[in-house]
Amino acid sequence: MRHLVLRREGGVKFYAPDPEKYGGIYSAPVFYNPAMEKNRTLSTLLLKAYGKGGLVVCEPLSGTGVRGIRYAVESGVVGKLILNDISKEAVELIKKNLEINGVDAEVYNEDANVLLHKLKDSCDVVDIDPFGSPAPFIHGAFRALKEEGLICATATDTAVLVGRYPRKCLRRYGSVIVKTPFYIEVGLRNLLGYIARVAAAEDYKITPLMSYWEGHYFRVCAYAARGARDADDNFHHIAYIKYERGVRKILHAQSEGSSGPLWVGPLGDPLIINKMSEIGPYQDFLKILAEEYSISAPWFYRLPEFAAGGKSPTLKEAVGVLRAAGIYAVRTHMAPDGFKADGEYGEVLMAFKRYISSAHSLQ
């Protein structure tokens, strides 16, 4: 392949197409997105914090192979690496990048779903990192998984997941989404809800370890364990949300104006996130995630929802007011003016009203 540039990311070096020669990354013969470095770094930390060695790791949509190579070089837990791409040019580049990093891997030139079905019951980790939606590959990912393991998926079709394209959202994820101020969380839980339903169909129970939003994508990593009876537990965390005048109502059946089906259970595990923050970068971001995951209630709030006289409290003030009122509250990574609170909308609103009334009485 012509027009390659040598790049470095994390602890590896690799060749990727020179975007200047191809008019951008989306026109290059093999896709590599430097904006996903944080995604790859956090996922590498997660594998390391997961704490199990000798893992069989499969990345069926490998592109340049950088994600899988980073897993092998940096995590210290990969026993066998399986890389694949349907593009012959990508496969050639993957082999080149494996060689310069001294990494061994099985490399395939297959349709991703064909490979995943061939790998039935043989993988500890399956990481779906497509250009667009992971939905077409989730069934195959569970088929390739052993009795237990990790399922990771990236979705860049965020506009679909948040309901901007209702028909496509219904076709692709089987969900109906209504716009809300916390639409980012709805989109993330939409993706998780889809993965949970597919998991149940494949007789797996899932436990999210890390789920987050970052600008142009959603990312989910979940522990999965096989067992038909336990798989039913997924549906204990599937529901609908209805938003009316600030109130977030969780419903167990669809009704007019509701969004769903969505995952309403935990978004992640604060313990594993804290482990990640101890061994790698992005500590501030991981701290926010760990705090968010410590609150079981879904749906974040936004400061303008509680504005009085055209003014909103600062985020720091809002968190302080709620904690003083006995309502645990933390920042959310999903909006700069957003916070999670372990309380219903009415309780949060009343706490702010008392604070505003008290402030006025002191003037």
UniProtKB/Swiss-Prot annotation:
Record: residues binding S-adenosyl-L-methionine: 40, 67, 85, 111-112
| EC category name | transferase
Q: Which reaction does it catalyse?
A: guanosine(26) in tRNA + 2 S-adenosyl-L-methionine = N(2)-dimethylguanosine(26) in tRNA + 2 S-adenosyl-L-homocysteine + 2 H(+)
Which Pfam family, giving just one, matches this sequence? TRM
Ranges for the Trm1 methyltransferase domain? 5-352
Keyword Chaperone listed: no
Q: Which InterPro entries match?
A: SAM-dependent_MTases_sf (IPR029063), Trm1 (IPR002905), TRM1_arc_bac (IPR022923), tRNA_met_Trm1_C (IPR042296)
Gene Ontology process terms (BP)? tRNA N2-guanine methylation
What's the stated role of this polypeptide? Dimethylates a single guanine residue at position 26 of a number of tRNAs using S-adenosyl-L-methionine as donor of the methyl groups.
Name of the protein? tRNA (guanine(26)-N(2))-dimethyltransferase
Q: What is the lineage of its organism?
A: Archaea, Thermoproteota, Thermoprotei, Thermoproteales, Thermoproteaceae
